[in-house]
Swiss-Prot record:
It comes from Ureaplasma urealyticum serovar 10 (strain ATCC 33699 / Western). The keyword Metal-binding does not apply. InterPro entries: Ribosomal_bL34, Ribosomal_bL34_CS. This is Large ribosomal subunit protein bL34. One of its GO terms (cellular component) is ribonucleoprotein complex. Belongs to the bacterial ribosomal protein bL34 family. Keywords: Ribonucleoprotein, Ribosomal protein. PROSITE patterns: RIBOSOMAL_L34. HAMAP family: Ribosomal_bL34. Signal peptide: none annotated. Pfam families: Ribosomal_L34 (PF00468). One of its GO terms (biological process) is translation. The lineage of its organism: Bacteria, Bacillati, Mycoplasmatota, Mycoplasmoidales, Mycoplasmoidaceae. GO terms for molecular function: structural constituent of ribosome.
Length: 48
């Protein structure tokens, strides 16, 4: 049986990246909450 996690950086960014988060109201809420919490990294495609 194939495992559920098949790493793919492009899909990772498309689904969980910063631009993907900014697209929706809820995504922006996610970013806002992570900023409030003081997360070192906001998204997977975050600061380089």
């Amino acid at each position: 049986m194939k495992r559920t996690f098949q790493p793919n950086n492009r899909k990772r960014a498309k689904v969980h990246g910063f631009r993907a988060r900014m697209k929706t109201k809820n995504g922006r809420n996610v970013l806002a909450r992570r900023r409030l919490k003081g997360r070192h990294s906001l998204t997977v495609s975050g600061e380089k």
